[in-house]
Amino acid sequence: MEKRILGLDPGLATLGFGVITCTQIANKVPETTVNMLDFGVIKTSADVEMGLRLCTLFDDLHTVMEEFQPDLVAIEKLFFYRMSSTILVAQARGVLILVLGQRRLPYVEFTPAQIKQALTGYGNADKLDVQEAVARELDLDEIPKPDDAADALAVALTASYQL
């Protein structure tokens, strides 16, 4: 059985997405294969009014959902030290959750520490360790760029380990 998982790294200026397929093969010992379909980012400009930025996220997220038809969406939970950053990302995250609700799509959320633990075995791993694990798990020649897209793939992989 194949599942398509969309990983999202929420952000207002840059929202990363990564799409993988997870196929379970029924042998004597069940085996799962994971393949990367696509990754990228949705960008908005700080020079544009907030409402228009959120509309861009809304429209572009619908486009991604329409193109890839995910079965499950995995989202990185908010984790910030600065309140101003948290508020901006929370607004973008609200749009994201709205799009998922409109499409009746199930979603799961993971903290940064859960993602690091799942991919590296260490909850305090650094960003490069996680990105290298993403490239290794997906059999990629290099780390996906930009970082937001690599992070989104990490979130999707974390969800695939829970299936």
Swiss-Prot record:
Disulphide bonds in the chain: none
Query: EC number(s) for this protein?
Result: 3.1.21.10
Q: What class of enzyme is it?
A: hydrolase
Which cofactor names does the annotation list?
Mg(2+)
Tell me the residue numbers annotated for binding Mg(2+) 2.
Answer: 76
Reactions catalysed, as given in the entry:
Endonucleolytic cleavage at a junction such as a reciprocal single-stranded crossover between two homologous DNA duplexes (Holliday junction)
User: What are the catalytic residues?
Assistant: 9, 76, 148
Write down the superkingdom of origin: Bacteria
Note on cofactor: Binds 2 Mg(2+) ion per subunit.
Q: Which GO terms describe its molecular function?
A: crossover junction DNA endonuclease activity; DNA binding; magnesium ion binding
GO cellular component assignments:
cytoplasm; Holliday junction resolvase complex
Q: Where in the cell is it found?
A: Cytoplasm
- Identify the InterPro entries for this entry: RNaseH-like_sf (IPR012337), RNaseH_sf (IPR036397), X-over_junc_endoDNase_RuvC (IPR002176)
Report which residue ranges the record marks as coiled coil.
none
Checking NCBIfam families in the record gives: PRK00039.2-1 (NF000711), ruvC (TIGR00228)
State the protein's purpose.
Answer: The RuvA-RuvB-RuvC complex processes Holliday junction (HJ) DNA during genetic recombination and DNA repair. Endonuclease that resolves HJ intermediates. Cleaves cruciform DNA by making single-stranded nicks across the HJ at symmetrical positions within the homologous arms, yielding a 5'-phosphate and a 3'-hydroxyl group; requires a central core of homology in the junction. The consensus cleavage sequence is 5'-(A/T)TT(C/G)-3'. Cleavage occurs on the 3'-side of the TT dinucleotide at the point of strand exchange.
Regarding protein family, the annotation reads: Belongs to the RuvC family.
Protein's name in the database: Crossover junction endodeoxyribonuclease RuvC
Organism of origin: Nostoc punctiforme (strain ATCC 29133 / PCC 73102)
